[in-house]
Structure formats: structure tokens, C-alpha cells
Amino acid sequence: MRVRNRKGATELLEANPQYVVLNPADAKGKWQELFGNDHPIHIEVGSGKGAFITGMAKANPNINYIGIDIQKSVLSYALDKVLATDVPNIKLLWVDGSDLTNYFADGEIERLYLNFSDPWPKKRHEKRRLTYKSFLDTFKQILPEKGEVHFKTDNRGLFEYSLVSFSQYGMKLKGVWLDLHASDFEGNVLTEYEQKFSSKGQVIYRVEAVFQ
């Protein structure tokens, strides 16, 4: 999600260390200690303005959530939502999520969410897609055995590519939704993009893939 630079974004992030972890590499292997409990940890790579991560945290108080985004302005808007919601089970990371092993130990994360990731439609940019093999390698490392990746997109090309990528990697497709909002799936928490696209009648695709 690209947004204009927000004046004061850096200062806002730095002023809220209770939610924004500025040196996440130091927390590697210690995230439950940082949260102050032994609850499972779920992360969202590319958390945007925070609608999904705050909604999930509010609905599931016994799960810890970490939202990751490289854009400080976007993350500052997510922080606004966190502060307004006042949920204790969220941390935000202002980092590049290309190698999550820099921040999380093996098996430290229970579940990973990819919501409306950049489709990078050109073939020469395939390696930048978050469901490309090299990303799956890092996801598998920080997730436990049978760890899950939950993926949503409005881009059919990326969806089909991801189904193939997951399958070729040897992952089990636990669930596939070709039109999420027309299905009987319960508990869906919308992202900002999802709210925008679905209101225009855009089909939303979803898959739950499990490492074997």
C-alpha cells in the first residue's frame, strides 16, 4: 500500500515503544517474553494501515500479533489504529520483511498472513512475489511443523501463481476460496484493500496452505 509521506511518522513510531519494536533483531527468540505471556504468535507481512491486524488482535485476545511493513508512513497509520483500539497483544515492526529469519527464531511463529501483497506481474519480477520459493523457505524456517500461511488477494494471476508455488513446494492446500465473500467462511477480518475492492464487486481469493 503506497501512501504519501506522513509528516512526523518517524517521531510517532519512535514515541510508542510499547507497540513499535525498533530493534526487532534483538527480540529474536524472545518474542513471548516481550509480550509477557506464552500465547502463540501470528504475523502479517505487509500490514498496511492496520485494519486486519487490529481486528484480529481484538477478536483473539489469546493470540499475539505482529504487523510488519517497510513503509513508515503506512505503519504510522497502523499505529493510530492500535492506539485507538488499545489492544495489548500487538507489536509493529518497521522493517523489510524479505528475510524474517533476521527477527524470528526457528518455529517461533505459529501462523503467517499475506494479505493483498504486491502481485509483481512481470515475469522478471517473479522472485519479488511473497509466495516465491525463496520466501517460502524463510517462512518455513520460522514456522513450526505444520505451520500455516493464510493468503488473500484480489489478483487472480497472483492467486493462481501462489497455488502452484505452494503445491510445488510440497505444501498442503488446507482450504481454497475462489470467491471469499460469497462463501460460508466465518471470521473474515477485512483489510483496507479488501474493503475497497469488495465494495466495487471485486472477487476476493483466499487460500490456507500448510507446510509438511
Swiss-Prot record:
Pfam families in UniProt? Methyltransf_4
Q: Which residues form the active site?
A: 118
Cite the binding residues for substrate.
Answer: 122, 154, 191-194
Cellular component terms, GO, for this chain's entry?
tRNA methyltransferase complex
| Reactions it catalyzes | guanosine(46) in tRNA + S-adenosyl-L-methionine = N(7)-methylguanosine(46) in tRNA + S-adenosyl-L-homocysteine
Family matches, as InterPro entries = SAM-dependent_MTases_sf (IPR029063), tRNA_(Gua-N-7)_MeTrfase_Trmb (IPR003358), tRNA_methyltr_TrmB_bact (IPR055361)
**What is this enzyme's EC?**
2.1.1.33
Keyword check for S-adenosyl-L-methionine: yes
**Where is the segment annotated Interaction with RNA?**
124-129
Does Transmembrane appear among the keywords?
Answer: no
Q: Which domain of life is it from?
A: Bacteria
Instruction: Extract the GO molecular function terms from the UniProt entry.
Output: tRNA (guanine(46)-N7)-methyltransferase activity
Entry's HAMAP family?
tRNA_methyltr_TrmB
In which family does this protein belong, per the annotation?
Belongs to the class I-like SAM-binding methyltransferase superfamily. TrmB family.
What this protein is called in its record is tRNA (guanine-N(7)-)-methyltransferase
Upper classification of the source organism reads: Bacteria, Bacillati, Bacillota, Bacilli, Lactobacillales
